[in-house]
Structures are given as C-alpha cells and as structure tokens.
Regions:
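Hydrophobic helical membrane-anchoring modules
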Residues: 1-7, 149, 173-237
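Conserved sequence signature across two-component system core domains
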Residues: 14-15, 44-46
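Donor nucleotide-sugar binding loop of glycosyltransferases
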Residues: 17-20, 48, 75
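Short, well-formed alpha-helical segments that are part of the catalytic scaffolds
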Residues: 17-32
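A conserved acidic beta->alpha catalytic loop
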Residues: 45-54, 100
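Acceptor/aglycone-binding surface of glycosyltransferases and processive sugar-polymer synthases
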Residues: 70-85, 92-94, 101-179, 206-216, ...
C-alpha cells in the first residue's frame, strides 16, 4: 500500500451556498479536530455566482484546508475533481455535501466501521421526499441492482467513506465529466466484490437556502444519470 500522509481527506463540493458554507466548514473542523485525525478538507467551489466564493476564500490560509475555485462544470465533475486530488492526500476519502442535510457529527459513525472494509456508505433514514424524487431514487436503486448487482439502500448518498487505493482504481473507468459519479461508484464497488459496510444516518431538511432541483429538473437529471450509468456499466467487468 502507498504511504500516505493523512488519515482522511474530506471532499466538499459547493455551489451557491452562501448561507450555509461557513457553518458547514466550521462544523467539519470541529468534528475532525475532536477526533484527533490527521486530515485535509478540500472545498471545491464550482463557479458560484453568489457570495460563496468569497466565503470559501477566507478559509484559504486555514490549517488543513485546501480551497479550490474553478469554473462551473456541475456537481458530478466537481466531485470527481475532488476525488482525484484527495486520493493522493490520504488513506481514506470522505465525500460530503455543503448543505448540512447530514450533520458532520455523524462522520464518526462511519469512521469506526472502516476496519476491514473498502467503503462505508451511509443511507438516509426517514427521508421526506416528494413523489417525483422518491421515484428517481427508486429507479437509481433498481438500475444499479440490475446493472451492477448492487443492493445498497442509498446509492447516491453524499456521505461516504472510500479507501483511496480502491477509489483510484474506480476513477480510472469513470469519466471526469461524469454527471452522477457516486451512483457509478456504488455500483462498481458491488460488482467488483469490494467489502462494503452500510451505516444509517439522520437526514434533515435544509433550514436555509433552497434546493437546486425542482421536480421537473429531478426527472430530467434522473434520466440523464440513468443513461450515463448504463454506459459506464459497460466498462466494468
């Protein structure tokens, strides 16, 4: 195994989250410091058009934080970009979103389950979704089951711990511009028989700001993710 400097690199993609991003970063610093981990936080701003960028830049000189400001490419490509940086920094990579719908204080539950595993994937309990979003989630779960023999309960959750050595292998087959890379990663982990542990997490509706997806947008993006998943499945054994 490669000799890596850090225990974990936390990848947080962000776009137009001026009301939440500062609180999100502060919470992650608090949690990781309390666990005495050797860590790095990667904040990747995907070309925000509000005050998010200026808030993120304030953390540029903070110890254990890297801030990356890049042109807008979308959530998926931003996750992949973060993963590709993170695998060279730490033994484990953790991905979280910046909306605080899953509190960072739940990270320790996944971290303690990592021993002997290649990935620890959260699953959201009591998730209050609209009918349309519930349908999109169901289709994603069925598609990964059919294409990858994946039985994970929450294939697209942005609260996942991945061993860098394994993630590096998967990233070789997932396009840099992937629209929904986490779904493909969930499927590939299962298909290639890596050791996966699931961990329930509490999901909270966001209290400030707005979700970037309407029901119609969720349907369109769900369809796009499905076609991409079919294509990606062909490059895995």
């Amino acid at each position: 195994m490669r000799k890596l400097l850090k225990d974990v690199a936390v990848v947080i993609p962000v776009f137009n989250e001026e009301e939440l991003i500062g609180e999100c970063i502060d919470e992650w610093l608090k949690v990781l410091n309390s666990m005495n981990l050797h860590y790095e936080i990667l904040i990747i701003d995907d070309g925000s058009s509000d005050a998010t960028t200026s808030i993120v830049e304030r953390y540029g000189d903070t110890q254990n934080i890297q801030t990356i400001i890049k042109p807008n490419e979308g959530h998926g490509p931003t996750i992949v970009a973060g993963y590709k940086r993170a695998v060279d920094i730490a033994e484990w990579v953790f991905q979280a979103d910046s909306d605080n719908e899953i509190n960072p204080n739940q990270f320790s539950a996944l971290w303690t389950k990592r021993h002997g595993k290649d990935a620890v994937i959260g699953w959201r309990q009591d998730r209050n979704q609209t009918t349309v979003r519930r349908l999109v989630t169901y289709v994603a779960r069925v598609a990964t089951k059919v294409l990858f023999r994946c039985h994970l309960r929450d294939v697209n959750i942005p609260f996942r711990l991945l061993r860098s050595e394994i993630l590096t292998i998967l990233l070789e087959r997932i396009p840099s511009n992937a629209f929904a890379p986490n779904i493909a990663i969930s499927g590939a982990l299962s298909l290639m028989n890596y050791q996966i542990e699931e961990c329930p997490v509490v999901f909270n509706e966001r209290t400030v700001g707005e979700s970037s997806l309407s029901n119609l947008a969720a349907l369109r993006k769900g369809g796009r993710a499905l076609f991409e998943l079919i294509k990606i499945s062909r490059v895995f054994p």
